[in-house]
């Protein structure tokens, strides 16, 4: 994992990430999936568009009955586990990633259905 200084240089430290509140624009990654300013920043600086694609794929499988999905990503020894839940400890899906160089130990993202698109966002953008 990266040091705090390295994360600062990448713009992925907790202070920088918490500065994303709301969003000025949406960025389409598929027909029904959008990123916010914060998740686009995370995908670019963390080189993890693969993560956004994985989230979009699972959201399509989960469906829209639950309009809110909490996504927890935890990285240990170069492997990641992505857990999709409803925010009340009910797990929708789990995916193991056998190798990743994602620079953070963990990250939590939210996904909200707006009746047309899933919007993937940082918690501070909710």
Residue locations for each model-derived region?
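Short, compact, well-ordered microdomains
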Residues: 86-126
